Regions:
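A short helix->beta-strand "capping" segment at the edge of beta-propeller domains
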Residues: 11, 20, 30-62, 329-342
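A short beta-strand motif characteristic of beta-propeller blades
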Residues: 52-58, 88-94, 126-132, 185-190, ...
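Beta-rich, blade/repeat-based domains predominating
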Residues: 59-69, 96-107, 134-148, 155-157, ...
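Conserved beta-strand positions in repeat-built beta-propeller and related beta-rich domains
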Residues: 74-79, 111-117, 150-167, 207-213, ...
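Blade-level signature of beta-propeller repeat domains, shared across WD40, Kelch, NHL, RCC1
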Residues: 350-377
């Protein structure tokens, strides 16, 4: 679009001034983008303790990404690739850097994102690397077809393990890419995202979660396979927690993982620029006022009023920096049911999910170092 001098420039300049004034007013009144209001967990998101009552399949230190090939579950454990055989984790391969994303293709090739800004295509059978390509801050991977890989890049400023730093710096430099394995070409899809953390193919449409925006978006393409975006709409917003990986079921429903809760104290800190700058520079990251995979393990952690233990007991409804939550969405992308591990629970930091037949749902509890199995009735 051509911009004519004079009137058009005045309109653009005036809009910028009005936007700046609106931002200042919102900051003063605590509304709009400066609001610290957190939606309650109610209705289909009402708290329960189902995750704490489910079967513990196995314990894996720093378990994160789950993916399925055939009848087996594969997982990441820091820099190790693990295969779960008869409820026992077996190390398949060890890498020099932390694994940040996993995705199997129909041909049996495993895409692996590493924290050194690299994506590998790995032959699990031969235990060999087929190809290696550079991508910044890989947070999620998805094989669209045997030759096409969708890549989520969380940030241009921080690596995937530094997700808390990106949140505290109000990061919005994430992006989605399409990579052709045969030609090794990259195609940019969409940018300026606030930490895209999950990808899912649904009827030739792309579903992705945006953690710091507390939302899930649906991209529709103009034609199958061309990756020209026809529409990009927000289908789920104002979530009470930070969304992560997404997996679809055989009946085209969705399981959405949410790895940590939002709360008003964190939302308030995110509006205080000077305070955040001092906290990031002077305080150990473990003790930031920020979400966590697991909290309550150190007396030096920040304490919220409702989180004080009474008679040595932490109330399940206490405000916490960690939580366990996974939500099932129906075909209209509305919450159908939710599984929780509350403040006093033992299945926090649900980062990833994988589905097997007969309603089996496997979940990685990064905060409590275990894989749990939920069987839907």
């Amino acid at each position: 679009m051509l911009i004519k001098p004079g009137k058009d420039l005045k309109i653009i300049g005036g809009k910028r001034v009005l936007d700046s004034i609106k931002t200042k007013v919102n900051q003063f009144l605590g509304r709009g983008t400066s609001s610290i209001f957190v939606p309650p967990m109610d209705g289909r998101l009402k708290a329960n303790d189902i995750l704490d009552k489910t079967e513990v399949l196995c314990e894996i230190e720093k378990v994160d990404n789950l993916t399925v090939f055939g009848e087996h579950i594969y997982a990441s454990s820091h820099n190790k690739l693990v295969k779960i055989i008869e409820n026992t984790p077996e190390i398949i391969e060890t890498f020099d850097y932390e694994i940040t994303a996993l995705a199997f293709g129909s041909s049996g090739v495993l895409a692996i994102g590493l924290s050194n800004d690299t994506v590998l295509c790995y032959d699990v059978g031969r235990k060999s690397i087929i190809l290696e390509v550079e991508f910044e801050c890989v947070t999620a991977l998805l094989f669209w077809d045997p030759e096409t890989l969708v890549v989520a890049s969380g940030s241009q400023q921080f690596s995937a393990p530094d997700w808390r730093s990106d949140l505290m710096n109000l990061g919005s430099t994430g992006s989605l890419w399409v990579f052709n394995v045969e030609s090794r070409s990259k195609k940019y899809l969409v940018g300026d995202l606030k930490w895209p953390a999950g990808l899912c193919k649904l009827n030739d449409q792309l579903l992705f979660s945006e953690a710091w925006n507390h939302s899930v978006n649906l991209i529709e393409f103009a034609a199958a396979g061309d990756f020209e975006i026809k529409s990009n709409q927000e289908i789920l917003s104002r979530l009470p927690a930070y969304p992560s990986r997404i997996v679809n079921t055989q009946d085209n429903c969705i399981w959405l993982c949410l790895f940590a809760p939002r709360n008003q104290l964190i939302e308030f800190v995110l509006t205080e620029k000077d305070y955040r700058a001092k906290m990031l520079s002077q305080v150990d990251e473990r003790f930031w006022i920020a979400p966590s995979f697991r909290s309550g393990l150190d007396f030096r952690e920040p304490l919220q009023g409702g989180g004080v233990k009474m008679m040595g007991v932490l109330k399940p409804w206490a405000p916490a920096f960690s939580y366990g939550l996974v939500v099932k969405l129906d075909r209209n992308f509305q919450p159908e049911k939710s599984l929780h591990s509350r403040a006093d629970g033992k299945a926090h930091g649900i980062t990833s999910a994988a589905c097997l037949p007969e309603g089996q749902l496997f979940l990685s509890s990064r905060g409590d170092n275990k894989v749990i199995r939920y069987i839907e009735q």
